[in-house]
Amino acid sequence: MKKNKGLMKILTIISILLVSLVVFSGCGKEKKEKEDKSYLDPINSMMTALQNKDIDEYLKTIPAEYQEKMEENYSNYKSLLKTQILDRLYSSLESSYGKIQKISYEEIEKEKMSDEDLKEEEEDYKSLLGDKADENKTYVTDGYKVKIKVIATTEDNGDKDEEMTVYVYKVNGKWYISMNH
């Protein structure tokens, strides 16, 4: 009888370990299967910038090297970007749809950027870096053509939406909006 009790304890412990192993390995698998959506980060920043007319948020969508070049050429580049991009785009949306309360978006689909498009982004980036560019290094490592539906919630006309395509690329490990498209 004591042998059976000892065997039962061992079987119970083994069963608990097996159940724990299945549960914990299943949880880890679930995390791995979740798709990395970090390519949407610059689109999120763009929408937040547009909603709040926030130039600093918008600048998160542009690599620092582009910003440095803009600053070299235009001392007031931030105010230029704000008036020429954010304010104009916001005004255009308001003239089309009415007074805007909220701007959001939904991802419709994404398509991997072609090797040709990535090469073009890479060449532009290296050109921007000039003498600082390492010709043996690849800076642009990934990219997507993301089709989104921009939703403008207005005071008078409810939700209005429009589809658009945004090109995003990954440079030095961070996602940005393409300056070429």
Describe the function of each predicted region:
Residues 22-26:
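C-terminal motif of bacterial Sec signal peptides marking the signal peptidase cleavage site
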Residues 157-181:
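Short beta-strand edge/turn micro-motifs at domain boundaries
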Residues 140-152:
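A short hydrophobic beta-strand element
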Residues 59-137:
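Short solvent-exposed beta->alpha transition segments
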Residues 137-142, 169-172:
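A short, structured loop/turn motif at beta-sheet edges
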